[in-house]
Regions:
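Glycine-rich flavin
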Residues: 2-5, 21-174, 202, 207-211, ...
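Flexible, glycine-rich terminal cap/loop adjacent to redox cofactors
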Residues: 8-19, 24-36, 49, 53-60, ...
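Short hydrophobic core segments
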Residues: 8-10, 116, 136-146, 180-181, ...
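A Rossmann-like FAD-binding core segment of flavoenzymes
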Residues: 113, 117-128, 197-300, 371
Length: 468
């Protein structure tokens, strides 16, 4: 095997493997180091992809139970086979990991299996499962090792009774009662999965609202929707302990306002309180500077404190910890290494919660705009007045567009919709090109589609929607 490269990427998650492919496409001799047996990182193996498989399957099951009969579809003797559902998820993941392997071969990227360390700025040492060390020379190094789940003090994740998101994607039977600690993206998606499949679900959230960082109008409405679906919430509550007794979990928590103590006994506890950068001792001991949050410090070109060593994705303190953000950074770094002008617009990175309905946003929230003392206008349009949503029985939610009062330029968009994750791309593109509400309002949208609600919300900025 050749041991000299132009670029060695450490980590084959969304940021790392995309960076490696783009480097190879730009003519750079590229290798990618990955410690796991499969490529794709957390996202592909135990995150974004398997969770979306279960979200889709569980929603199909819910519709068959609750909605098919109203449509004239009589699904008698409906049965749930969890093992088959999990097998379908695993097959999808395997196919996609094999797809990344194919792309590596297609682009002539050298896949190095093992753990990486950086003894010098031009050397990467790879240690395989048998502890054999091999040195590789390189002109540039890109660190994209992602993140891992965090827990709370005193709560030990065993992936049996007390689980991380990875464990909650692989239950071999449906828990009768599930407690989810954390009301963010991951917690709410997995709460939805297991509620649909039959679990009694309680979400405990430290704050007085769900999905921190989301527009308050959205989080308030979304909470109502999830309550209606049967998910229980304990907001403004602090978990003080979790114990396991005879394969059952006991969760103790206290209300932050009145100090009332409560206890719930359940079959499983999902700890979904966030993620932290995955920076191994082998990487941190290389002399690369970290910030106060233990993330790698980088400049505007994603270069660390050591020249020609770059970092992307969840290990740096730029933008949200999202797979598609890491992908964009991976492409930008590849272009920078190749002598081009790589760039990421952090003001136009969409975020999506893949529940049903979905929640999506891009740009600033109304709360952020108020804090920044920007004069603004708001346009809203409900899906109750959208024809496609009406015939599909998907009328929950609305689109909210916020624009600069003086320029009409779009500052932020938030929405709840059955297809919000797909719809938000239009708004990300609009913001990338500096569009105004009028630009969107004057753009012809196909009828009947959910996306017409975007056009109507843009019209509503000037209080003149057509259908509401």
């Amino acid at each position: 095997m050749d041991s000299n490269f132009d670029v060695i990427v450490i980590g084959a998650g969304p940021g790392g493997y995309v960076c490696a492919i783009k480097c190879a496409q730009l003519g750079l001799k590229t290798a990618c180091v990955e410690s796991s047996k499969t490529l794709g990182g957390t996202c592909l193996n135990v995150g974004c992809i398997p969770s979306k498989s279960l979200l889709n399957s569980s929603e199909m099951y819910r519709k068959a139970q609750k909605e098919f009969n109203n449509l004239g579809i009589e699904a008698n003797n409906l049965k749930l086979n969890l093992a088959k559902m999990m097998n379908n998820k695993n097959k999808s993941v395997l196919a996609l990991t094999k797809g990344v392997e194919f792309l590596f071969k297609k682009n002539k990227i050298t896949h190095l299996r093992g753990k990486a360390s950086i003894p010098t700025k031009s050397t990467v040492t790879v240690t395989d499962d048998l502890k054999k060390k091999t040195n590789f020379k390189t002109k540039n190094i890109v660190i994209g090792t992602g993140s891992v789940p965090t827990s709370l003090p005193g709560i030990k994740i065993d992936e049996k009774t007390i689980v991380s998101s990875a464990g909650a994607l692989s239950f071999d039977k449906i828990p009768k009662e599930l407690v989810v600690i954390g009301g963010g993206y991951i917690g709410l998606e997995l709460s939805s999965v297991w509620k649909r499949l039959g679990s009694k679900v309680t979400v405990i959230e430290f704050l007085d609202h769900i999905i921190p960082g989301m527009d308050k109008d959205i989080s308030t409405e979304f909470l109502k929707i999830l309550n209606k679906q049967g998910i229980n919430f304990k907001l403004n509550s602090k978990v003080t302990g979790v114990s396991v007794v005879k394969n059952k979990a006991v969760v103790d928590f206290t209300n932050n306002k009145n100090a009332t103590r409560e206890r719930i006994q359940c079959d499983k506890v999902l700890v979904a309180v966030g993620r932290k950068s995955n920076i191994s001792a082998d990487i941190s001991s290389s002399g690369i500077k970290l910030d106060s949050q233990n993330k790698i410090q980088v400049n505007e070109k994603f270069e660390t404190s050591i020249k020609n060593i770059f970092a992307i994705g969840d290990v740096i303190n730029k933008g949200p910890m999202l797979a598609h953000k890491a992908e964009d950074e991976g492409i930008a770094v590849a272009e920078i290494i190749a002598g081009q002008a790589g760039h990421v617009n952090y003001d136009a990175i969409p975020a999506v919660i893949y529940t049903s309905p979905e929640v999506a946003m891009v740009g600033k929230t109304e709360e952020q705009i108020i804090k920044e003392k920007i004069k603004y206008k708001v346009g809203k349009f409900p899906f109750l007045a959208n024809s496609r949503a009406k015939v599909n029985s998907e009328t929950e939610g609305f689109v909210k567009i916020i624009v600069d009062e003086k320029t009409d330029r779009v500052l932020g968009v938030s929405m709840i919709s059955a297809v919000a994750g797909t719809m938000i791309a239009e708004l990300a593109l609009a913001m990338e090109f500096g569009a105004s509400a009028e630009d969107i309002a004057r753009t012809c949208h196909a009828h009947p589609t959910h996306s017409e609600a975007i056009k109507e919300a843009a019209m509503a900025v000037d209080k003149k929607p057509i259908h509401f």
